[in-house]
């Protein structure tokens, strides 16, 4: 384990002493260090009647147990302090470590022995081997009462609200959209779990079209066959209009009642970060949105009608919209428990909705935590004029996603009444998708949140993985740079795939978010501020560094690609084409081994480099016909240890999200030997070689100069490493599979790779 502590806040000494005293650690600033440590430890072991026993089973050094040490005349030393501290954090002395000073350096332990009271205070705020901070572990065990009131420690809310005796209710928010054109505003179901409290509390909201269930069978039937020819497009410039949103006004009167009338029972799933905040005094709201089970309307996936309906939930929390007790719309209930302040959470589609909500500039949305969220839907299902699929899901497109998320069809009555209209709406969607050309058009323009990024007022926290080929890193990169300069923005850029990171051992993500939300939603005045970029170092396990920016580098490193011309044959023998189509993983393996139709160029790294931004290929290229699909991947090549893209379980159900509440696995990205690691990749329709909005002819056998930017990333390379550039046509995981007989030729002498460093 390595310690990477970003959540700790430096407080004045008087605050430290006061907070310690409130937790029963009655330490005196004038006492000697040894006496203070003993006083601290006897309170620490509050679950024991006889505190001599737990002291006797800890060690001060290799020859002395801690009780014997306290009974001796020996002085407290730095070595003894560290030895005790590591044991309190769950490390076994003489098993996990033998020399505390060596272990301190190996783990990057954040505490430097000096002022003992401040050391002990920071120790309580440090994560244990099993994933909780020490103070959270003690609170979970009953250090302070579960009194349904707020208690703070180091600028973070503690788990002092009951997660057993909570209010579980359902309301139906009246949205400002009428997606199915029935002349009535759509209703959106809101599932609420909130702690009991006499005053007003903030809300954690997760906007998830998946929450009420998904129609997997209908979605699977809607998948597309990827084996189609690349379309030869007519040259033209794409014209677009400003997206429009038509809102509807509230209708009718509704009796105001004191409380919701529908009780929330079982929910399909919760997000463990939300579970963590519930006993800390934050309401949990789960909203599936229009077109989902128990709500009304069509599934409009990604457009501002869908976003508006989610926004209206925040409006209700602030008294600007109504919520009914049921579908009759006869009785309404106010969110009189809400302080109006909201943070949004969730990954993938959930993080996408956070991005979209932020771009409305809605009052009350204080923080978004957008994890692996889409910023422009075109870049999810298309790329540079090509029809593509999100990584791992070949054949998926917008209409199959609509079938997946239109969970109203899971209710037989809704299916009978509404499926015909839903299918008619889907036909319109299919026509607008333009799966034939892969071009950007008005349909995608209406689902581009970057156009409204200037409206964002909330503080923004992103998480994204360098190995996320589902929602590719371009999404967070573009959103990060499109945000107004005056707002606070932060990015946790890890080396995983499309995954959550709130339960990783190496980073205090939950505690950092706690510090942020306690400040922004609960009004605690602290100077807590996350760095702009927190980046997971790819060269070592469990190592995180603070960076000033993502991209925007002034310097670059250029690699020439060779001296000759090389060709990429597009067509495969039928046997190989069928084999790769059945299992794209086989294609990826053979591509990395140099066995596919490809140009492979090994590039020695002659000095240490820190890639930060978008690698760019400048290629002189020609096609043997009037079309061309170009794929590129940049690998670090060579057998060595690399971080793996999916977290592994270190210990099962050891993270406590409250007081024995929603126990969670502790995980981490493994660091183990592999033959290569993907650094970045990209895909390009050569007819869109100069601009996404400009379609140009390709003349057979005529040279073209192409500037091709790959996916943004942050990646460290060392002198002696090897980069491998792979150029090819069809990618059996991502692109359409055109097996026509043509080839691309690259003049390597007139081509180069540029890395921003």
UniProtKB/Swiss-Prot annotation:
GO terms for cellular component: cytoplasm. It comes from the Bacteria. It catalyses: Hydrolyzes Xaa-Pro-|- bonds to release unblocked, N-terminal dipeptides from substrates including Ala-Pro-|-p-nitroanilide and (sequentially) Tyr-Pro-|-Phe-Pro-|-Gly-Pro-|-Ile. Pfam families: Peptidase_S15 (PF02129), PepX_C (PF08530), PepX_N (PF09168). Gene3D superfamilies: 1.10.246.70, alpha/beta hydrolase (3.40.50.1820), Galactose-binding domain-like (2.60.120.260). Removes N-terminal dipeptides sequentially from polypeptides having unsubstituted N-termini provided that the penultimate residue is proline. This is Xaa-Pro dipeptidyl-peptidase. It comes from Streptococcus pneumoniae (strain ATCC 700669 / Spain 23F-1).
């Amino acid at each position: 384990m390595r310690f990477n502590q970003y959540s700790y806040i430096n407080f004045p000494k008087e605050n430290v002493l006061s907070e310690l005293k409130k937790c029963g650690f009655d330490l005196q600033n004038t006492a000697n260090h040894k006496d203070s440590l003993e006083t601290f430890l006897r309170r620490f072991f509050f679950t024991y009647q006889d505190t001599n026993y737990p002291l006797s089973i800890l060690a001060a050094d290799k020859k002395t147990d801690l009780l014997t040490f306290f009974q001796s005349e020996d002085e407290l030393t730095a070595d003894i302090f560290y030895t005790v501290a590591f044991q309190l954090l769950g490390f076994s002395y003489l098993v996990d470590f033998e020399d505390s000073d060596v272990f301190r350096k190996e783990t990057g332990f954040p505490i430097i022995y000096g002022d003992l009271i401040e050391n002990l205070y920071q120790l309580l705020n440090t994560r244990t081997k099993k994933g909780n901070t020490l103070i959270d572990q003690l609170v979970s065990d009953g250090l302070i009462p579960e009194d349904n009131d707020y208690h703070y420690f180091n600028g973070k809310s503690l788990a002092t609200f009951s997660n057993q005796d909570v209010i579980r209710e359902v309301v139906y928010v009246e949205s400002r959209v009428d997606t199915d054109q029935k002349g009535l505003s759509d209703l959106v179901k809101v599932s609420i779990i909130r702690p009991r409290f006499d005053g007003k509390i903030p809300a954690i909201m997760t906007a998830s079209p998946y929450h009420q269930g998904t129609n997997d069978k209908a979605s699977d039937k809607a998948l597309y066959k990827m084996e189609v020819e690349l379309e030869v497009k007519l040259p033209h410039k794409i014209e677009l209009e400003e997206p429009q949103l038509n809102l509807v006004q509230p209708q009718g009167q509704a009796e105001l009642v004191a409380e919701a009338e529908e009780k929330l029972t079982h929910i399909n799933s919760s997000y463990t970060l939300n579970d963590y905040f519930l006993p800390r005094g934050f309401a949990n709201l789960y909203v599936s949105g229009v077109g989902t089970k128990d709500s009304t309307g069509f599934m409009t996936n990604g457009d501002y009608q869908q976003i508006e309906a989610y926004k209206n939930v925040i409006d209700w929390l602030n008294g600007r919209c109504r919520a009914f007790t049921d579908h009759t719309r006869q009785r309404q209930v106010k969110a009189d428990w809400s302080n109006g302040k909201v943070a949004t959470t969730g990954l993938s589609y959930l993080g996408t909705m956070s991005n979209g909500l932020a771009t409305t500039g809605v009052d009350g949305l204080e923080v978004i935590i957008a994890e692996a969220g889409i910023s422009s839907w075109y870049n999810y299902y298309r790329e540079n004029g090509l029809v593509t699929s999100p990584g791992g899901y070949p054949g998926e497109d917008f209409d199959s996603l609509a079938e997946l998320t239109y969970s109203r069809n899971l209710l037989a009555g809704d299916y009978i009444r509404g499926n015909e209209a839903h299918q008619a709406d889907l036909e319109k969607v299919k026509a607008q998708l333009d799966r034939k050309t892969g071009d950007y058009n008005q349909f995608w323009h209406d689902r581009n949140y970057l156009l409204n990024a200037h409206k964002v007022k909330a503080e923004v926290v992103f998480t994204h993985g360098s190995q996320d080929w589902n929602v590719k890193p371009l999404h967070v990169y573009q959103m990060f740079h499109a945000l107004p300069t005056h707002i606070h923005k932060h990015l946790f850029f890890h080396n995983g795939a499309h995954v959550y990171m709130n339960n990783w051992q190496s980073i205090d993500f939950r505690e950092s978010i706690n510090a942020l939300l306690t400040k922004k939603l609960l009004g605690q005045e602290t100077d807590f501020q996350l760095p702009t970029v927190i980046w997971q170092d790819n060269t070592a396990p469990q190592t995180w560094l603070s960076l000033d920016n993502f991209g925007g580098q002034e310097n670059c490193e250029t690699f020439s690609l060779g001296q000759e011309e090389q060709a990429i044959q597009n067509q495969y023998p039928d046997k190989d084409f069928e084999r790769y189509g059945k299992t794209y993983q086989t294609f990826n393996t053979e591509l990395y081994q140099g066995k596919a139709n490809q140009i492979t160029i090994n590039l020695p790294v002659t000095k240490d480099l820190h890639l930060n931004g978008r690698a760019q290929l400048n290629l002189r290229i020609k096609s043997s016909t009037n079309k061309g699909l170009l794929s590129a991947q940049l690998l670090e090549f060579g057998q060595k240890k690399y971080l793996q893209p999916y977290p592994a379980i270190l210990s099962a159900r050891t993270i406590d999200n409250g007081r024995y509440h929603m126990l969670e696995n502790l995980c981490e990205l493994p660091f183990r030997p592999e033959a290569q690691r993907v650094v970045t990749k990209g895909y390009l329709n050569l007819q869109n070689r100069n601009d996404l909005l400009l379609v140009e002819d390709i003349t057979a056998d005529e040279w073209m100069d192409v500037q091709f930017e790959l996916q943004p990333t942050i990646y460290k390379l060392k002198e002696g490493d090897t980069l491998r550039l792979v150029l090819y046509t069809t990618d059996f995981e991502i692109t359409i599979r055109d097996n026509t007989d043509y080839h691309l030729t690259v003049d390597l002498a007139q081509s180069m790779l540029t890395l921003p460093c």
